[in-house]
Amino acid sequence: MNTESCDMVRCHDDDAVLDGPPGSFYITETEAGKIMWLKLPDGAASAINLRPHTTDGPSWEWDGNEDRPTLTPSVHRVGSWHGFVRNGRMESC
């Protein structure tokens, strides 16, 4: 499992997240709520649902800060990376 930590970098679209370094992120608004595109330290990009208590998959509480976000609970990609997003930093467990 990847144990890297990194600072986050805000991007202006989801393509920039794919091309950016680990920690790159972009927040978009959908009809269902906000979604964060996030590049994990394992190098993979994932969509993180920022809707609390959703019934159609995992979701995270978000502090609303679009520059240095904090998410709860931890983010876990099985077998690859597990950590916390706190104050604009991805911290490996």
Task: Show the residue positions of the predicted features.
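A short Gly-Trp-Pro
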Residues: 1-37, 46-93
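Aspartyl protease active-site motif detector
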Residues: 40-42
